[in-house]
């Protein structure tokens, strides 16, 4: 009887967590099924039909989608996978916290309903898939972090696989990945010396992984996504330095546009597909056929060397807009029929849009807010770095901070989704840190 009284509350808490996670998954289906297709997702799905793989979007996402697609052809297959990973993550976290208190356990699936996290689960972007992949990796490691033996080793192997898979989805995460990997390898406590020791070798390993999988195993076509960053930088440097840094000559009207009118610290699309400045990429790509060649790389290197202050001004302007601006959040357009409303006659989705529209002007939907929250959590967790709870928070929030900051150098658009990993890392860390540290089990 004594044993039953001690274990019954924990069992009830775990059952409640499972029910809440299942209910959350069901709510996700009611609101979003069969998933919100974006233009990025549409391009990836079209590559499946064409049997082509490119590196502009992640070829690994194309392969993954092609594998799960027979289960529910179209957007539904990848949507169901993302939603399942999301609720599995928060369900596992709550299940693991049930031995501490029912309140902490239940708070995990409840916090999963926070608008900046939940509102993106049904939107098919690789940034969302990346976020839930890393979230699941960290939580799988956390669940077994107070144990020793084969179960923990298996959990760590799964978590490291998911960490690497996330890098393959978002290669700019390879600088942040070593922090998450260090947590997965040593989940019981965080030691900065160990993390520093593996940092550079881990970057090299993850970089090699991308090269091997993308171009060796999958044979992806090189579409030169890095040069989109360089084109954006050349436009920014030209604007701030008031000198044309593109490797082409413009006529007087084009020169005026490039130096004074085209540039906005929001996105590189202004030089690619938006009037009146899409002539820039048309000239570089179709006209002079320079895009994808060393001419762009050399022009970029010269521009940065000649005008480092202009480069920093451009990048700082972009980063400020990314962190503080009212940027694109959830996707609500119907990409198949742009003139039609997405999910007409669905009250649940309409209610979600209404809540989103009311909250969008608030700090909840600012990337900078979640960067600051991640920093605050990491500072708070530092004094508990010798515990599994502190190690978890430092691992996820530390990697989120570095990941968001990479956009200072590589960002070409300001969408809120690029900070989605920081949202998930922060939300997951809250219930972990709220209670007292747990004792280590054998």
Give the residues covered by each predicted segment.
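Aromatic- and kink-enriched transmembrane "portal" helix at the membrane-lumen/periplasm boundary
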Residues: 30, 59-62, 66, 71-75, ...
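Membrane-interface anchor segments at the N-terminal boundary of transmembrane helices
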Residues: 72-77, 311-397
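Membrane-interface alpha helices of multi-pass inner-membrane proteins
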Residues: 26, 155-170, 181-184, 199-206
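Transmembrane-helix signature of polytopic, membrane-embedded enzymes
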Residues: 12-16, 93-115, 131-132, 150-153
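Extracytoplasmic catalytic/substrate-binding loops of multi-pass membrane glycan-assembly enzymes
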Residues: 31-44, 52-64, 68, 73-76, ...
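Specific aromatic-rich, kink-prone transmembrane helix
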Residues: 92, 131-148, 159-163, 179-180, ...
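Membrane-proximal stem/loop segments at transmembrane-domain junctions that anchor or position
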Residues: 219-342
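Transmembrane-helix motifs of polytopic, lipid-linked glycan transferases
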Residues: 80-100, 136
